[in-house]
Amino acid sequence: LSRRVVMYHLKELSFREFLQFEDFRLKLPKFQLDDLLKNHKKIARDLKQQLTTPIKYFDAYLKHGAYPYYLENRQSYASKLNQTINLILEVDLNAVENMPYEDSRKVKKLLIAIAQSAPFIPNITRLSERLGMSRVFLINAIKLLNRADLVMELYKPTKGVGALTKPEKLFLNNPNLVHVLGNQNAEIGTLRETFFANQMKHLHDIHLAE
């Protein structure tokens, strides 16, 4: 029998999953988005009976809660996450996309540029001039970073998305990446916006408002 590989897209830990790693005694139910919107006060009161300091846990989640290897050593988490990013850019892109090393270095340069400003509305012409890339290479590189779960692309709902369509707004894929690649002192609004988009995108279609 030939070997068969089942592909599975394993996303980051949710905040609920992170909490259960932090305290195995917690029994936290799942909630549908509609239920949260309609009954958020009651849900918050019920959760408060189990979880007395949610903000403390949430702050920790934003810094190191996305990937479970934080459990091995929290002090070296940022370094290990940086190593994972380098592995994706320098090894995985070459293996999957047959990308030369020099091009992977350009993609890394792009990721750093995004990290310094995310979330932001990209000016493709200005970015391509600044980074020394063609427009086509730049847009393709953004798509690759999105597929690698390093950035998120957002579009307006009325706009068609094609292979060479530039995103309306770019985010880093989760708050941990904001801390590691962008800014250790990132604004809490940026972190919360990134968190919300990350948690919603796997279960819902999210768009920029018109």
Label each residue range with its predicted role.
Residues 2-105:
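Interdomain motor-coupling "hinge/lid" segment immediately C-terminal to the ATP-binding subdomain
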